[in-house]
Amino acid sequence: MDQQRFTHLLQLEAESIHIIREVAAEFSNPVMMYSIGKDSSVMLHLARKAFHPGKLPFPLLHVDTGWKFREMYAFRDHTAKAYGFELLVHKNPEGVAMGINPFVHGSAKHTDIMKNEGLKQALNQYGFDAAFGGARRDEEKSRAKERIYSFRDRFHRWDPKNQRPELWHNYNGQINKGESIRVFPLSNWTELDIWQYIFLENIEIVPLYLAKKRPVLERDGMLIMVDDDRIDLQPGEVIEQRMVRFRTLGCWPLTGAVASDAQTLPEIIEEMLVSTTSERQGRVIDRDQSGSMEMKKRQGYF
């Protein structure tokens, strides 16, 4: 690909860098959420560009559920060491003490306690007044109507009917004590934009995004990769090796793989050009009930 043919990516890059710099200048204690996925990798790359040759003026925060893929943990630690940024890792201690897990307690309770409550705990503990997230509007309908600067009250709740206008790239970050802003620099990017940018900028990603023979089982119409011995096999389920990759990454028991032969970035991009389904079709948490993502966001989720 010739970078000069992708001027829209340069425009998206410039917009995102402007937003990141704006937040760093406007807020007293910002943080960048780091979920280890492709969007986080792009957002981190943009942040490093925004402040090059200096260091990032804010830490990265990973809210750990204890159920991420092993390759994700390895990639997280490798990336933090390679780039030398401050990495904060928070795991909900109450959830750990209760032994919360997706097999016993289900996806909704696991997500609420380990991700949603864990996130709010970390934001309160460190007193962050702004938090960057890698969500994009093309991912899901509730995210499609959310502003780039997403106002949250002192309980971290989002009210879609109480959003601020964003005219001519002017963002309103005025908040009272205890309130905060969630910031989405990648709002206007698409999944295809993300992959093209990763290719053009040679951004390192978790290998799980590339197709490979992996141990999977079929459950509720999804291909679940068996990542460790905590798997709870149901009667009739069989683990088999299949060529699969992931379009989105989360907790391994709650994230479905897709059958694919795309082992390189150009092959992934080719897949994206003909895809007619959302990348979040592989997320069990989005299937909990109708409008489940918006409900989670109203309660404090990203």
UniProtKB/Swiss-Prot annotation:
A Gene Ontology BP annotation from the UniProt entry: hydrogen sulfide biosynthetic process
EC number: 2.7.7.4
GO molecular function: ATP binding; sulfate adenylyltransferase (ATP) activity
Claim: S-adenosyl-L-methionine is one of the keywords in the record: no
Keywords, sorted A to Z: ATP-binding, Nucleotide-binding, Nucleotidyltransferase, Transferase
InterPro entries per UniProt: PAPS_reduct_dom, Rossmann-like_a/b/a_fold, SO4_adenylTrfase_ssu, Sulfate_adenylyltrnsfr_sub2
Source domain of life: Bacteria
The reaction(s) this protein catalyses: sulfate + ATP + H(+) = adenosine 5'-phosphosulfate + diphosphate
Pfam families: PAPS_reduct
EC category name: transferase
Pathway: Sulfur metabolism; hydrogen sulfide biosynthesis; sulfite from sulfate: step 1/3
Family to which the UniProt record says this protein belongs: Belongs to the PAPS reductase family. CysD subfamily.
Function as written in the Swiss-Prot or TrEMBL entry: With CysN forms the ATP sulfurylase (ATPS) that catalyzes the adenylation of sulfate producing adenosine 5'-phosphosulfate (APS) and diphosphate, the first enzymatic step in sulfur assimilation pathway. APS synthesis involves the formation of a high-energy phosphoric-sulfuric acid anhydride bond driven by GTP hydrolysis by CysN coupled to ATP hydrolysis by CysD.
Summary of subunit composition and partner proteins: Heterodimer composed of CysD, the smaller subunit, and CysN.
Protein name: Sulfate adenylyltransferase subunit 2
Organism in which the protein naturally occurs: Sodalis glossinidius (strain morsitans)
